[in-house]
Amino acid sequence: MDGPMRPRSASLVDFQFGVVATETIEDALLHLAQQNEQAVREASGRLGRFREPQIVEFVFLLSEQWCLEKSVSYQAVEILERFMVKQAENICRQATIQPRDNKRESQNWRALKQQLVNKFTLRLVSCVQLASKLSFRNKIISNITVLNFLQALGYLHTKEELLESELDVLKSLNFRINLPTPLAYVETLLEVLGYNGCLVPAMRLHATCLTLLDLVYLLHEPIYESLLRASIENSTPSQLQGEKFTSVKEDFMLLAVGIIAASAFIQNHECWSQVVGHLQSITGIALASIAEFSYAILTHGVGANTPGRQQSIPPHLAARALKTVASSNT
C-alpha cells in the first residue's frame, strides 16, 4: 500500500444531528420510504446469497484498513451483492443457451463458474473502490493502493485490468451504484427522533447503531432465520415461506427501526418504549414487527442479558411481551 494507514472511525468524525432543516429531513425520509417500497417489491429470491460472513468481514476490514467511513463498507457490500447476483444470472443464462450436449454443457458450466471464482477478489476490491468514490468525505482509493493490496494477496493485475473490472461492475448495474444502505435509513430516523424529543441522545444511539448494524451484516442469515421463525411461530419454516420472506430481508426501513430499537434498549431500557412508540408513529411499522426485530438483534448481539432469554421464553412470546410493554407505555 501507499505507506501505513491507521484505521479510524471515520463515520463519527464531524458527525452532528439537529443541524438540518425539518423540511429537508421530511423530504429525505419520504424519498427513502419510496425507495424502500420499490426495493421490497422488486426483491429477488437470489438476493442475499453473496452476503456471507467471510465476504462481509473482508469488506469491513478492508474499508477499515483504508480508513473509509462505515457508510462506504455498507455501500460496497450492497454493490458487490447486486453485481454478483447479475453475474450468477448471466452464467445460468449462458448455460441454458448452450447446445444440449451433457458433457459439453458440464464443461462450459464449470468454466464459467471458475471464471467467476478467479475474479471474485478483484471484483470485491473494485466494489470497495467504487463505493469510496461515492462519498465526498472520503479520499478516493488510488489504483496503486489497490494493486499493491492485491499483489500482497498473491494476485497480479495491471491498471488496465483494474479499470476494466470497475467498468464491468458499472455496466452490469447500468451505472446505478449509488445504492441506498440501511445506515441512511438509521441516520434519517435518528434525525426525526431528535426533533420529536427522544429521551436518548441521537449521538449515543448512533454509535450503538453502527455496532449493531455491523452485527446484522455479519450475522445476516441467523438473525433473519430467527426472525422468520418468530414471525410464523414455527421452528421449521417451509421453502415457500423462506422465499416469501426475501422481501423482508430487503426492507431497510424495517431493519433501521429494529436497529434503533435494539440500540435504545442497550443505552437506556427505561426509554425503550418511548423510542419504539416514536418509530411506530414515524414509519407506520407495527409495534410487533419492531419488537420482534429488536429481539432478534439483541439475542444474537447480547444473548443472555436479553429480556425473555433469562426466563427461557420462546422468541415469539418474548417479542409479544416487548410489544405489550411498548403498547402500554406509549
UniProtKB/Swiss-Prot annotation:
CC annotations in GO: chromosome; cytoplasm; nucleus; site of double-strand break
Using the record for this protein, list the coiled-coil segments as residue ranges, or answer none: none
Localization recorded for this chain is: Nucleus; Cytoplasm; Chromosome
Which Pfam family is one of this chain's hits?
Cyclin_N
Chief location bin: nucleus
For whether the record's keyword set contains RNA-binding, the answer is no
Q: Which UniProt keywords apply?
A: Chromosome, Cytoplasm, Meiosis, Nucleus
Tell me which InterPro entries the record gives. Cyclin-like_sf (IPR036915), Cyclin_N (IPR006671)
Give the multimer and partner information: Interacts with PRR19; this interaction promotes crossover formation. Interacts with RFC3 and RFC4; these interactions facilitate crossover formation. Interacts with CDC34; this interaction regulates the cell-cycle progression.
Name the job this protein performs: Plays a role in the different steps of crossover formation during meiotic recombination. Participates in the crossover differentiation step of crossover-specific recombination intermediates through its interaction with PRR19. In addition, stimulates crossover formation through the interactions with RFC3 and RFC4 and simultaneously regulates cell-cycle progression through interactions with CDC34 and subsequent ubiquitination of WEE1. May also participates in an active deselection process that destabilizes or removes excess pre-CO intermediates.
Query: What name goes with this protein?
Result: Cyclin N-terminal domain-containing protein 1
Q: Which organism is it from?
A: Homo sapiens
